[in-house]
Amino acid sequence: MELTLWTYEGPPHVGAMRIAASMKGVHYVLHAPQGDTYADLLFTMIERRGKRPPVTYTTFQARDLGGDTAELVKRHIREAVERFKPDALLVGESCTAELIQDQPGALAGGMGFDLPIVSLELPAYSKKENWGASETLYQLVRGLLKNQEINSEGHNPKAWQNQGRRPRVNLIGPSLLGFRCRDDVIEISRLLASHGIDVNTVVPLEATVADVMRLTEADLNICLYAEISESCCSWMERQFGMPFSRTMPIGVGATADFLAEVHGLLGMDPPDPREGEHSSKLPWYSASVDSTYLTGKRVFIFGDGSHVLAAARIANEELGFQVVGLGTYSREMARPVRAAAKELGLEALISDDYLAVEAAMAEAVPELVLGTQMERHSAKRLGIPCAVISTPMHVQDVPARFSPQMGWEGANVIFDSWVHPLMMGLEEHLIGMFRHDFEFVDGHQSHLGHLGGLQSAQVEDAPAAIANNSTETHAIEADTSSVAVATATLEWTMDGEAELKKIPFFVRGKVRRNTEAFAKEKGLNQIDSETLYDAKAHYSA
């Protein structure tokens, strides 16, 4: 067991709550102590929903453990069915209740209710939230569809051609507390409609039990979020022969690939491969003269597996960034993330320890961080600009405006949200011209945050400097708390630091890295001004 101030994912029963709260007519009875009711706040505060999630807690207390807690479970199940009259009932237990082993699912199944009951067995001590959401969706869909007749001729995704209708698809995976899921559904529905494809149903977001029963009426399943929907789509492929798309349409290239894959599976004519050039502004904006400052920017990417893979492709192929760090907290997505990192010449960071992520971020010295809410906090401490690309997120990442991540419009949103935190090229020239002005010293960078964690680092060891400007020194020491990790064996002398400060701060990080690499190569423990000059000559040769 590990004590932490932050976790990227909640326990699996929170994932089950996400599925139940996303749907209509589904109720979740959760065998849990009173302390586990905190999850309600995730939906009312983060998602800003006007109603509580459809969850009934047994809320047992310590004194109940000496009696028959099974009767407590049965009473709450009975009351929930009578009060809410759900079309389907989910029954499970929290991490604490799992230790009691009351088996609430089996109890509910023996109570004789005339409605579908799905028993959830979510191992709280080995799995987490996204897995819990995936397993809940899989068990719910399987429980509702298992008795449907299977077409003896097999499922034909091209049947629409003979039936004289437009092709139909299901959108599987969008849920509450997902990153921009509502807007993604709207954008992908519009995109498919523009290609003559209808959406049969969306599951689980805003879906009813009747919608789930209609899943097999579609020609194709679209797996929008692999963490949530891949297991469900795989089961439907095995059970009913329904194929599903695997490309996540985030970014111009991925959206084009997504359309090509969907058209191919449905037997439609291939789409125009250059559609994205006139449907999204990202290709033109990223190729414009004003955007040449994007090329080579160092970017660190961390989040859930699906969004990390999409972000890495956009950063590398569409914006010309240099990806210097790639990782995920989702162990279920570790394999594809490792493969993507290997293609970029990196070693993937698979961890749910935010301190390890922050240390890797500081060591990589990025100029932009793409991550979760926690990476935004870490980047702020290090003085690095950041854009949130993945859950877990803050309420400010659930905007009132239309702000998808998928499709052509999603590419526009991504360009704006990733590029705006960066310093524009003209700003760099102006700061270079006026860097000696008191308004442009390191302590007055305002909101720019363009500097990497090590670029803004200035270690003031001289007593005179501390006496003259103690406030600035304390700020600098706070920014450079991570530098010691990366340079524990190297020491900058006073004249070396003084010479380094003469270099414009927006390139200072690169000079520092090169000089330290040069010093390590030469076996030096101290870096003075002469070492700095030698390193400059070495890399300029």
UniProtKB/Swiss-Prot annotation:
A molecular-function term among this protein's GO annotations: 4 iron, 4 sulfur cluster binding
Keywords, ordered alphabetically: 4Fe-4S, ATP-binding, Chlorophyll biosynthesis, Iron, Iron-sulfur, Metal-binding, Nucleotide-binding, Oxidoreductase, Photosynthesis
A Pfam cross-reference name: PCP_red
Root EC class: oxidoreductase
GO BP term (any one): light-independent chlorophyll biosynthetic process
Protein residues bound to [4Fe-4S] cluster: 36
Binding residues for substrate: 425-426
Protein purpose: Component of the dark-operative protochlorophyllide reductase (DPOR) that uses Mg-ATP and reduced ferredoxin to reduce ring D of protochlorophyllide (Pchlide) to form chlorophyllide a (Chlide). This reaction is light-independent. The NB-protein (ChlN-ChlB) is the catalytic component of the complex.
Annotated protein name in UniProt: Light-independent protochlorophyllide reductase subunit B
Gene coding for it: chlB
